């Protein structure tokens, strides 16, 4: 996936990937933490929620931060609170997300972060292995 960014500037390494799943898996493997900036695309929200979900599942133990400039993420945080109040999100899972209105405050909070929620599944491996006798895709296909 290659999308031109408005600024035209590149920071760090640019890596071309085939799809969103590969993009998220690559970010999860290589990132020390995750920060959601103000996004103009659904991809920002989708990636954010997947990183929160992976933390809850125990796939990673990295900080997930929201740079909440001018209250941009207030409605999302209120949605999470409602999920807890209604019993759809466990109280401990609220600790997965760290939020602050400035980059400096967010970095300070993220540096202090330690996972305190209970995982709902055991740690998963990033490596994919064939199951039993099932052939991999395109294997043993009639020519």
From Swiss-Prot:
It comes from the Eukaryota. The keyword Hydrolase applies. Substrate binds at residues 23-24, 41-47, 53. Coiled coil: none annotated. One of its GO terms (molecular function) is cytokinin riboside 5'-monophosphate phosphoribohydrolase activity. GO terms for biological process: cytokinin biosynthetic process. The keyword Hydrolase applies. Its EC number is 3.2.2.n1. It holds the Pfam family Lysine_decarbox. Keywords: Cytokinin biosynthesis, Hydrolase. It catalyses: N(6)-(dimethylallyl)adenosine 5'-phosphate + H2O = N(6)-dimethylallyladenine + D-ribose 5-phosphate; 9-ribosyl-trans-zeatin 5'-phosphate + H2O = trans-zeatin + D-ribose 5-phosphate. InterPro entries: LOG_fam. It is an enzyme of class 3 (hydrolase). One of its GO terms (cellular component) is cytosol. Cytokinin-activating enzyme working in the direct activation pathway. Phosphoribohydrolase that converts inactive cytokinin nucleotides to the biologically active free-base forms. Belongs to the LOG family. This is Putative cytokinin riboside 5'-monophosphate phosphoribohydrolase LOG9. It comes from Arabidopsis thaliana (Mouse-ear cress).
């Amino acid at each position: 996936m290659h999308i031109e960014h408005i600024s035209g500037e590149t920071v760090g390494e640019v890596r071309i990937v085939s799809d969103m799943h590969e993009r998220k898996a690559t970010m999860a493997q290589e990132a020390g933490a995750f920060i959601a900036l103000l996004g103009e695309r659904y991809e920002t929200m989708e990636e954010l929620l997947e990183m929160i979900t992976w933390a809850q599942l125990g796939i990673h133990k990295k900080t997930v931060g929201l740079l909440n400039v001018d209250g941009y993420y207030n409605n999302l945080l209120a949605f999470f609170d409602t999920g807890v109040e209604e019993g759809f999100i466990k109280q401990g899972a609220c600790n997965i997300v760290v939020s602050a209105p400035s980059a400096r405050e967010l970095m300070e909070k993220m540096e202090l972060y330690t996972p305190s929620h209970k995982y709902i599944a055991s740690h998963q491996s990033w490596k994919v292995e064939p199951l039993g006798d099932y052939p991999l895709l395109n294997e043993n296909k009639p020519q």
